[in-house]
């Protein structure tokens, strides 16, 4: 299977799972487990084909480490964004106009949290999926699941 299609599928199902579990309240503690589990199975399904980045930040980190060819980076990122956007539209189509209880926007703390957790995700990926010390380790999927959950 084409590595760009794998990135599209992985990002699609990750965002689809997020959309179906957290858009409206009620999933509780199951939402992070569902999201992490969806990521885990997609990593196991596509890791051997594309590296299973499923996130442009992860692709950038893996490229900076020298484990992703420069020629693949734009294709990976386009596939990930297109997959995520299509999944978001499907969530909107299925759920209609969901009622999201949003508080007062607080941009700076949100950006700080996003940066820190994206850093943590990239850090885990670089240390469990791209390190020479863990070559042959096929258990990185559940480690990403735990970090993502």
PLM regions with names:
Residues 1-149:
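Membrane-interface helix-loop junctions and terminal tails of multi-pass membrane proteins
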